[in-house]
Amino acid sequence: MPLSRSLKIACFSLATTLSSTSLANETSSQQILLSYANIASDAYTATLADATSLQSAINRFANAPSAQHFSQAKAAWLTSRESYGLTEIFRLSGGPIDAEDGWVATAYGAPEGQLNAWPLDENMIDYTINDEGKRTSGNIIDTAGQFNPGGEDATAIDVSKITVTALASLNENGGDANVASGYHAIEFL
């Protein structure tokens, strides 16, 4: 009796597997691409909503600094970074985040470097404490006027007023570690 029951289970399992394989073979590449596109769209939609919440939390903190607003901004960063992290499975697919040429890059501007550039030279943004225990200088925050981030072919940028344009111009200006915008820069600050 146990052998017969085991045999039935094995046959049922085999039939289920063959049926699933047959269904998989019938699935067209269009259906697979549509599913992929829907997953990507859902992930990017969630990322945009979370990034918008992060922007609101940062604005609240900047306009009315408090421990509560700081905690809310940190929590919003964690949520936003997590949802953006899920979109990284779509990297290197020539999509709206990292396309470097063609109509997609023209339409979306390939913002991946502005969002997620790494590694980060923290000293470019604000002071750090060096190995001698002294505060460093020569960063965006303590510079009035033109700031040159250093590196290869770096261009000085006016940081008298820190604007979106100034930060975008500084980002990766002179080298990959010259990161002035995105999740890692916000995390440092």
Write out the residue ranges for each language-model feature.
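Bacterial N-terminal signal peptides that target proteins for export
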Residues: 1-11
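Short, linear, compositionally biased motifs with a strong N-terminal bias
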Residues: 13-16
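N-terminal signal peptide c-region/cleavage motif recognized by signal peptidases
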Residues: 19-21
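Mature extracytoplasmic or organellar-lumen-exposed domains after removal of signal/transit peptides
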Residues: 25-189
